[in-house]
């Protein structure tokens, strides 16, 4: 007589374990593996985009007022650098806010994964 195999994890002899055959229509997949997890929203990156957008807007307005002469300190030699810095700060903020807005509304092709996250 051969010794019976035992299930080492439970200590139960294998002859006493009941098995049931899987249904023939089972393709080996479970529904849970196809379920999409809710998107992880990068709050820090969106907050940084808001700050960049606001600072850039402020600098563009100040630069335009300097250039138009409504603010008389400095003239054109100060207006152009302020405008350039304002545009350089405004553009990334606007870009990432636009992606965040479209991702929140569920537009096709936009997701929160497109926004760089600053998780440590």
From Swiss-Prot:
Q: Which Gene Ontology cellular component annotation is one that this UniProt entry carries?
A: recycling endosome
Keyword Nuclease set for record? no
Per UniProt, the keywords (alphabetical) are: Cytoplasmic vesicle, Endosome, Golgi apparatus, Membrane, Synapse, Transmembrane, Transmembrane helix
Q: Where is the signal peptide?
A: none
Entry annotated with the keyword Membrane: yes
Output the InterPro entries linked to this UniProt entry. Answer: TMEM230, TMEM_230/134
Which domain of life does this protein belong to?
Eukaryota
Transmembrane stretches, start-end:
46-66, 79-99
GO BP annotations listed: axonal transport; synaptic vesicle transport
Family statement drawn from the similarity comment of this UniProt entry:
Belongs to the TMEM134/TMEM230 family.
Q: Where in the cell is it found?
A: Membrane; Golgi apparatus, trans-Golgi network; Cytoplasmic vesicle, Secretory vesicle, Synaptic vesicle; Early endosome
**Subcellular location, principal:** membrane
Primary gene name = TMEM230
Membrane topology annotation: Multi-pass membrane protein
Q: What is the lineage of its organism?
A: Eukaryota, Metazoa, Chordata, Craniata, Vertebrata
Q: What is this protein called?
A: Transmembrane protein 230
């Amino acid at each position: 007589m051969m010794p019976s195999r035992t299930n080492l994890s439970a200590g139960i002899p294998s002859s006493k374990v009941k098995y049931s055959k899987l249904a023939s229509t089972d393709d080996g997949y479970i529904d849970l593996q196809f379920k999409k997890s809710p998107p992880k929203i990068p709050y820090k990156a969106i907050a940084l985009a808001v700050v960049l957008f606001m600072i850039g807007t402020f600098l563009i307005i100040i630069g335009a007022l300097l250039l138009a002469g409504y603010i008389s300190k400095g003239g054109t030699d100060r207006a152009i650098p302020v405008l350039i810095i304002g545009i350089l700060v405004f553009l990334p903020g606007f870009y990432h806010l636009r992606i965040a807005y479209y991702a929140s509304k569920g537009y096709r092709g936009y997701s929160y994964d497109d926004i760089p996250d600053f998780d440590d």
